[in-house]
Amino acid sequence: MKVILKENLDNLGHIGDIVKVAPGYARNYLLPKGLALEATTKNAKALDHAKKHLEYKKNKVLEQARQFAARIEGIALTLSHQAGEEGKLFGAVTNMELAENLKAQGVEIDRKKIVLAEPIKQVGDFTAIIKIHPEVNATLKVTVTKA
């Protein structure tokens, strides 16, 4: 029996693939759980239309992510922390602190999306990577000064 997959399945294929499976597997598992549709011309046309719509939405989200990344890259954060004689900070600058400072500047982002290559424990200039979308990353410039 031929079916059209509605979801990615490790053992069968990806969304939209037309695969041949055992009739019992299709009737008892794939179709009742909504993982696949019977492969008819009507269902194939409906799936093509849904694919085009999803592609349009994906491109729109990607463009919004790129605009958001450009907005973030235009920001330079300056933080002042207490530091010792040699510029070593008492504590460290965390991604949570960076998220709070970005929020104060009108850019709200989840702290888990901010990636620091290494903890910021010195006075100086640093960069942080912000993962906005699986295909779009932004670079944030962070300057830490002595308070």
UniProtKB/Swiss-Prot annotation:
Chloroplast is among the record's keywords: no
SUPFAM superfamilies: L9 N-domain-like (SSF55658), Ribosomal protein L9 C-domain (SSF55653)
One GO location term (cellular component): ribonucleoprotein complex
GO biological process assignments: translation
Pfam families the record matches: Ribosomal_L9_C, Ribosomal_L9_N
Keyword vocabulary terms for this entry: Ribonucleoprotein, Ribosomal protein, RNA-binding, rRNA-binding
Family to which the UniProt record says this protein belongs: Belongs to the bacterial ribosomal protein bL9 family.
HAMAP family: Ribosomal_bL9
Protein name per the record: Large ribosomal subunit protein bL9
Organism: Geotalea daltonii (strain DSM 22248 / JCM 15807 / FRC-32)
Gene name of the encoded protein: rplI
